[in-house]
UniProtKB/Swiss-Prot annotation:
This is Tol-Pal system protein TolB. Belongs to the TolB family. It is found in: Periplasm. PANTHER family: PROTEIN TOLB, PROTEIN TOLB HOMOLOG. InterPro entries: 6-blade_b-propeller_TolB-like (IPR011042), PD40 (IPR011659), Tol-Pal_TolB (IPR014167), TolB_N (IPR007195). Part of the Tol-Pal system, which plays a role in outer membrane invagination during cell division and is important for maintaining outer membrane integrity. One of its GO terms (biological process) is protein import. It comes from Shewanella frigidimarina (strain NCIMB 400). The gene is tolB.
């Protein structure tokens, strides 16, 4: 068995071992270097207890982004402020934070609430402190109010996080996104579960339960469908499933391997790995007509296709050079060019949404880690420091990578920032979780 075949067998074995569905995020590195920000509890202007804590969600989002660290509310000079009108610059003169998030929540009819929030520029406030009277409204970076229903608190909290993140970084936030992943609970009649959840593990939903392995989930560009590989019929088949209607479509069921689906940027086609003509090769399948087009032709294994953002090329893993490496094939000319040369193996690659970086699994000295290559300079940086890393998936804003890894002998999910500075682990209770796929913007 050659090296790539052994790797594919290892991935299959890993995917068929034990899992828990609830995901938590434990930050392991990178907090000290993050940008400080203050988030105070939103003031509840109604009777009885507040229906939800928006500030807790916003603070957690910003901390998990790897860009910010939220300050302890107990150490803030004004922890009950609700708007810039109650802001006193002198009180914040010695607080090391660049911005402050404040807000209010009040009843607005049956099961509805008016949520207001403001983003205050603390840097500007501190520069102006001591210069006499000032107009606090000049300190506002953002101010919004929205009416939401009782079941929208968490969703709108993520929306606030998106707004704050983009205002302070210039990069669109990805807190309203979701992840898909595979859970395996051994001992059950149908131990293989295809799950989706909010990016932070909340609002988990099971899409499919099967007695046979499920693997390789991938999102459509519109975020409405998932493609995945199922062995429910005792053979590898590729399905596309609408996550809202639950409608499933069988796309590929040839003899042999049907694997590694990847949606084209227009959502109309899948790049897949098929062995119907002999060796595993890269094909493109039209989802509507099921028509197939062979893209590669080589005696070595070609697998793990991934599209470039312009839809004109496909990245894939091949052993045609003797060891697993990443290659690019043009869909116009079928010309193949090698992309990676450092390390022993490089595989499982994908291109960042902006087309500037390639994320992949690198094996050096027998250790598998997540790596990033700048496509302009070809500089490679190893991002992760965990073990047996696999299945990297990039956030739609290109700032974070979620991937599968091993922690204390169990398969778990982990995350790392694109600069490698911030690291987090998504621990589980019983069983294992793997094969993560980050959704597009929703």
């Amino acid at each position: 068995m050659n090296n790539l075949a052994k790797w594919l067998t290892l991935v299959l074995i890993v995917l068929t071992t034990p899992a828990r569905a609830a995901l938590d995020i434990v930050i392991t590195e990178g907090v000290d270097a993050a940008r400080p920000i203050a988030v105070v509890p939103f003031v509840w202007q109604g009777q009885g207890p507040a229906p939800a804590s928006i500030s807790d969600v916003v603070a957690s989002d910003l901390s998990r982004s790897g860009t910010f660290k939220t300050l302890d509310v107990r150490a803030l000079p004004q922890s009950t402020i609700s708007s810039v009108n109650g802001f006193t610059a002198q009180n914040w003169a010695n607080v090391e934070a660049e911005a402050l998030v404040v807000g209010t929540v009040k009843p607005y009819g049956a099961d509805q609430y008016l949520v207001s929030f403001e983003l205050i520029d603390l840097v500007k406030a501190q520069l102006q402190a001591g210069k006499g009277p000032q107009n606090n409204n000049e300190l506002l970076l953002e101010s919004r109010e929205t009416v939401i229903s009782a079941n929208q608190f968490r969703q709108y909290s993520h929306r606030i996080s998106d707004i704050v993140y983009e205002k302070l970084t210039g990069i669109r936030g990805a807190f309203l996104t979701r992840i898909a992943y595979v859970v395996v609970k051994q001992g059950q009649k149908a131990p293989y579960h295809l799950m989706i959840a909010d990016y932070d593990g909340y609002n988990e939903q099971m899409l499919l339960r099967s007695p046979e392995p499920l693997m390789s989930p991938t999102w459509s560009p519109d975020g409405r469908r998932l493609a995945y590989v199922s062995f429910e019929n005792r053979k590898a088949e590729i399905f596309v499933q609408d996550i809202y209607s639950q409608t499933r479509t069988l796309v590929s069921s040839f003899d042999g391997i049907n694997g590694a689906p990847a949606f084209s940027p227009d959502g109309k086609k899948l790049a897949v790995t098929l062995s119907k003509d002999g060796q595993p090769e890269i094909y493109v399948v039209d989802i509507a007509t099921k028509a197939t087009r062979r893209i590669t032709e080589h005696y070595a294994i070609d697998t793990e296709p991934s599209w470039f953002p312009d839809g004109k090329s496909i990245l894939f893993t091949s052993e045609r050079g003797g060891k697993p490496q990443l290659y690019r094939v043009s869909l116009d000319t079928n010309k193949v060019s090698r992309m990676t040369f450092e390390g022993e193996w490089n595989l499982g690659g994908s291109i960042s949404p902006d087309g500037r970086s390639m994320i992949f699994v690198n094996r050096t000295n027998g250790k598998f880690h997540i790596a990033r290559m700048d496509l302009a300079t070809r500089f490679m940086q190893v991002l992760s420091s965990t073990q047996l890393d696999e299945s990297p998936s990039v956030a739609p804003n290109g700032t974070m990578v979620i991937y599968g890894t091993t922690h204390q002998g169990k398969q778990v999910l982990a995350a790392v920032s694109m600069d490698g500075r911030f690291k987090a682990r998504l621990p589980v209770g019983q069983g294992e979780v793997k094969s993560p796929a980050w959704s597009p913007f929703l």
